[in-house]
Regions:
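N-terminal glycine-/serine-/threonine-rich beta1-alpha1-beta2 phosphate-ribose binding loop
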Residues: 1-112, 125, 129-141
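Predominantly a Rossmann-like dinucleotide-binding segment in NAD(P)-dependent oxidoreductases
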Residues: 16-21, 140-145, 150-209
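Hydrophobic residues within beta-strands of alpha/beta enzymes
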Residues: 91, 114, 171-174
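A cross-family glycoside hydrolase active-site/sugar-binding cleft signature
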Residues: 94, 117, 145-147
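Short helix/strand-capping hinge loops at secondary-structure junctions
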Residues: 111-113, 117-119
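Conserved PLP phosphate-binding loop immediately N-terminal to the Schiff-base lysine helix
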Residues: 123-125, 154
Length: 209
């Protein structure tokens, strides 16, 4: 199960310490469904990890137990965080979707439950991998929770129920739009790692997000 046997505390590892990851960790630490403790953090960028740690430590001092040796930076940091939380713990996976299949697969392999944000992968191959991992999780009795917030909205569920009952008649076409400020991308300056530069600008590169 998700609960650690010795003290019933749910151990959390945060992988991806940006705004969404920090928010998801805060949600988990403020949950009323069980005692929770953040024990490991991982990110490619040290500044993101530091900012997230300071914010969470300030808000949940008694529940954030992440000493320097359990704050991991780099592309392999996710492995160290998953190992630190251990079997039965929970990984909060909130990186950009390029890394989701790799990280979630490793967590399930190590016996760690997963909460992952959307989107689940940037391409069909990654999506198929996530579906394969889901089957593996079922076989191991591990849980994968997904951040599809609209599916948890009772108002939206009621609206969809009405549509399915025919309240709008026969639907022949649906168009959905999202209004956004748009993406501005400056030229690559050439004085740093281009991969890291692209990761800082995820919405400009399809492979990242």
């Amino acid at each position: 199960g998700v609960h650690a046997a010795e003290d019933n505390v749910i151990r959390l590892a945060l992988v991806g310490c940006g705004g969404r990851g920090s928010g998801a960790a805060a949600n988990a630490l403020s949950s009323s469904s069980g005692p929770t403790r953040l024990v490991a953090m991982a990110d490619v960028f040290e500044d993101r990890l530091k900012g997230s740690y300071n914010a969470l430590q300030g808000q949940f001092k008694e529940q954030v137990d992440v000493p320097p040796e359990r704050r991991f930076v780099g592309f392999d940091a996710y492995r160290k965080a998953i190992d630190a939380v251990g079997p039965g713990g929970v990984m909060i996976q909130a990186t950009h979707s390029a890394f989701r299949p790799l990280h979630v697969g490793h967590a399930i392999e190590k016996g760690v439950h997963v909460f992952m944000e959307k989107s689940f992968a940037p391409d069909p191959a990654g999506t198929r991998r996530i579906l394969q991992i889901a089957d593996q999780a079922k076989q191991k009795n591990l849980k994968i929770g997904c951040g599809l917030m609209c599916r948890h909205s009772s108002a939206r569920q009621a609206m969809i129920g009405k549509i399915r009952e025919g309240a709008l008649g026969q639907i022949v076409l649906i168009r959905a739009y999202r209004m956004d400020a748009g993406i501005r991308l400056e030229p690559f300056p050439g004085n740093q790692s281009e991969v890291l530069w692209q990761l800082r600008r995820p919405y400009a590169f399809l492979w990242v997000s």
